[in-house]
Amino acid sequence: MSDSPSLQDSPTPAGSVRSATERTAGLPQLVLLLTASCLSVLGAVLIAPVLPQIAQEFADTAGVDVLVPIVLTAPSLVIGLTAPFAGFIADKIDRKRVLLIAMVVYAVVGTAPLYLGSLQSIIISRVLLGVCEAAIMTCCTTLIGDYWSGPRRSKYLGLQTLVASISATVFLALGGALGAAGWRAPFWLYVVPLLLVIPMARLIWQPTRHRAGEALHRHLEPVPWRQLLAPCLVTLFGGIVFYALLVELSFVLTGVGVTSTATIGGISAIMSLATAVGAATFARLSRYTPRTLLPIEFGLSALGLVLVFSSTALPVITLGAVFTGFGTGLLLPTLLTWAVNRLRFEQRGRGTGLWTGTLFIGQFLSPILLAAISAGVGGLQPALGVLGVVTAVAALTTLLLVRRNNERLDVTRD
């Protein structure tokens, strides 16, 4: 079989046929969808380095200490709340149309802080940015599921996590560099989607699926909510674990006496690399079932968190970050593939939106829960230790409760 991306990786389901004129997806479509998938990362991390400057700029605003962090976190919460609705619209109307509109609006509201004069108006623009990110993430992931099937779909969903992990490191560096020119400067990067809109309009298409002898469905096929319950519940907790050390590692390092920003950045980059390696490994392991992979992934993450808790020595903390990064990098595509592989074309947008929403709610809850645990156990490192123990319990729970008869992750139904 040729290694070029193709829609023909596995047989189509019985009773369905593809249009004779339907196009075949290839590298251009993959590059566009993976690049657009990074926009939610851009929204999440780009302005983190300039938050102190924003706080200083709006120091006279009432509640500035609460409002400035919301500028960073608002998009994640909004994605969590609106992604299922974005999936509904994508299924009901048209994936491509929703994606292109969201890309244009993303650029408009993303760059709005360049000229907005109040903290409240900036937060409103960030809320609207989150709505756009929800639509973009849901449509891109859904289209990857539409265009490819079988092992190749698993490979590209893992690649989506890998690219997002690498882009987070790049965007943090860009945000810091642009921030030297003022706190508004990083917001110029939100024009990037406009560079993708024209290629997307030409190269991305709305797939169509026909049942033999029938017209296209006008009514939405019901989503198997019970089937999605287990993947989404595990994803909610997985999102908390995934973002815990990603957000808190720099605070841990500062707490053990590290003052060099280069050292903090270097260890954070090592963890990001481990996450990328974990995501890249998924393609080789997708022949296994969730019941096999989830205990390993949660187990590695738990080991890393406990190591970070157990020592103030940098080599031990770094090793813990590597274990957790690798485990969560492998975890994310496992959870995504587990959720979407069992969905039919007509259900995929809503199912993907629900999964995306639960992941980002987990991301939003992660620092809040760790702050609450920290207050109860006397510090951030002990809180990470508690999360490590809970994650170890999750590893055992998935081994015992996830169904034995789950399909391999490289087997698709549509």
Indicate where each model-derived feature is located.
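Helix-to-loop junctions at the C-terminal end of transmembrane segments
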Residues: 82-94, 277-290
